[in-house]
Amino acid sequence: MIVGVILFGGKGTRFSKDFPKQFLKFNGKALMEHTVEKFLLDCFEFLVVVSNKDYINKSIEILKKFEKKIYVIEGGKTREHSTFNAIKFLENKIDLEDIVLIHDGARPFVNKDIIEKNIENAKLFGATVTAISSENTIAVVENDFILSVPKRDSIFIIQTPQTFKYKVLKDSFFKFSNRLDNFTDDSSVVLASGYKVSITEGNKKNIKITTVEDLHLMGVDEIVGG
């Protein structure tokens, strides 16, 4: 079985003080709709949408038009706590060998090819993350001074989806359940648990929408508030 988890747990304060970015409308639909539509694929048994508790009802209202089975659950105080909530929600619904794909709700431009390659690599390796190679030289800095400059061919920019066998996620997140504030993405929790994580090639268009300017860069002109 394959399930998709889409994270909309934050309030998007960098985007707008008035409403979360998932409800911003462009090209006639809310950002949430654009993202979820990418996962209305036959391979997914069901989807889990993780929402800020204040917007669960609004999320349900937006998503009820889709025929796919979609559960809307409450998110946590951070991204990783939201992922952990989804992992616990899935405990009695799927088996340990099943595949769980986790995606940032603010990445509406993900495509089917990336999703399918994630699933394929998770089946092969147990854990995989979407990433693109860095075109820029990256420096490690401390106190405003450069400590080192890693080789560019070893630097990758992490995106989502991040996809795992359920047993890998469950083992990793329960192991670090009291230290999830130390992590910023799912793969770092899995790595800390001793698992290897493979790379699935992403693309530049699979950006995370953080500001209105990000949508303009993607060629979106008509943007309407939530």
UniProtKB/Swiss-Prot annotation:
Cross-referenced Gene3D superfamilies: Spore Coat Polysaccharide Biosynthesis Protein SpsA, Chain A
GO biological process terms on file: isopentenyl diphosphate biosynthetic process, methylerythritol 4-phosphate pathway
Entry EC number(s): 2.7.7.60
Site (Transition state stabilizer): 14, 21
Catalytically driven reaction(s): 2-C-methyl-D-erythritol 4-phosphate + CTP + H(+) = 4-CDP-2-C-methyl-D-erythritol + diphosphate
Pfam families the UniProt entry points to: IspD
Domain of life: Bacteria
Keyword Disulfide bond (UniProt): no
Pathway named in the protein's UniProt entry: Isoprenoid biosynthesis; isopentenyl diphosphate biosynthesis via DXP pathway; isopentenyl diphosphate from 1-deoxy-D-xylulose 5-phosphate: step 2/6
Swiss-Prot/TrEMBL keywords: Isoprene biosynthesis, Nucleotidyltransferase, Transferase
CDD domains, per the entry: CDP-ME_synthetase
UniProt GO MF annotations: 2-C-methyl-D-erythritol 4-phosphate cytidylyltransferase activity
Site (Positions MEP for the nucleophilic attack): 152, 208
General function of this protein: Catalyzes the formation of 4-diphosphocytidyl-2-C-methyl-D-erythritol from CTP and 2-C-methyl-D-erythritol 4-phosphate (MEP).
Family annotation (PANTHER family): 2-C-METHYL-D-ERYTHRITOL 4-PHOSPHATE CYTIDYLYLTRANSFERASE, CHLOROPLASTIC, RIBITOL-5-PHOSPHATE CYTIDYLYLTRANSFERASE
Family under the similarity heading: Belongs to the IspD/TarI cytidylyltransferase family. IspD subfamily.
Protein name: 2-C-methyl-D-erythritol 4-phosphate cytidylyltransferase
